[in-house]
Amino acid sequence: MNAHSLSRRRILTLAAAGLAFPLGGLPLAAAPRPIAMRPIPSTGEAIPVLGMGTWITFNVGSSSRLRDERVKVLQVFFDHGGRMVDSSPMYGSAEDVMGYCLKRVRDPSPLFSATKIWTSSDAGGVVQMQASERLWGESQFDLQQVHNLLNWEFHLARLKEWKVSGLIRYLGITTSHGRRHSDFAEVMQAEPLDFVQLTYNILDREVEDRLLPLAADRGQAVIVNRPFQRGGLFQSFGHHPLPEWAREFGARNWAQFFLKFVLSHPAVTCAIPATSQVGHMEENMAAARGPMPDADTRRRMIDYVERL
């Protein structure tokens, strides 16, 4: 947390209050409304409800052309108020590419950096953290997570030490694809986690039964991965018409329909869709603005897609 992040938050607060002042020659009132924010339960710090994942999309190797295209994607993310970027040593060159992009974006929002430890080796966790710091160009990660519970007992104990010493600000665990939910719930119950990351979307709703209520009870922030089912939702439903009533909660395309379903769950703190396209990033970020579907509308959304 630095002076820049505080000033940014102050600007967003003033904007939300309807106060306008010059910014780049334009009144602030002319800019898009700030995206929705949610508090991290363990501290109350507010973060945007929409972050960015990097799995596959930022694993582009050393290609200058592809890296520069990702700079444009990250620039749009920051221009729209995005903050949380999530990656992992598991994601090939994604962390290296992220470091490349962070050095080249202009006037970014305050980054909320999130990465993971993914190794069965005890000593390997330290090696991965140091490598992530070097690749990103970050001296302190906001969030460090144990990826897919791999060697979680050892790594989580180390993360607790790192948090106390100030090497990281928050700690958490992750799962995806619906794996190991029983084990995941046990760790949630037993450990003082700031964040949990899991898969949730309009078709994959198993976490509604246990993990999301448990996170709410335990005061753990929830990051949602695979909100588009890795593109599967578009393949299944993208050729069907969007219902007219989706405009009532501001969804003008399927991406916003799917994201607003995820973001409207009261236990969800942030979703991290991944994209390599500037236009898709624009659509995604718009989903974090405006009204969200209520409980009745959420049921209507589920019923609609299940009938297609």
Describe every region a protein language model picked out.
Residues 1-19:
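N-terminal secretory signal peptides and thylakoid transit peptides that target proteins
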Residues 21, 40, 192-195, 210-308:
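Structured C-terminal cap/extension of enzyme domains
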Residues 25-53, 63-64:
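C-terminal segment of N-terminal export signals and the immediately downstream linker at the start
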Residues 40, 52, 85, 98, ...:
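Conserved, mostly hydrophobic/aromatic
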Residues 41-44, 99-108, 132-137, 163, ...:
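Acidic (Asp/Glu)-rich catalytic clusters
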Residues 56-67, 116-122, 248:
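Active-site mouth loops of central-metabolism enzymes
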Residues 61, 119-206, 210, 217-223, ...:
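Glycine/proline-rich, positively charged
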Residues 86-101:
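Glycine-rich, proline-tolerant flexible connector loops at the mouths of alpha/beta enzymes
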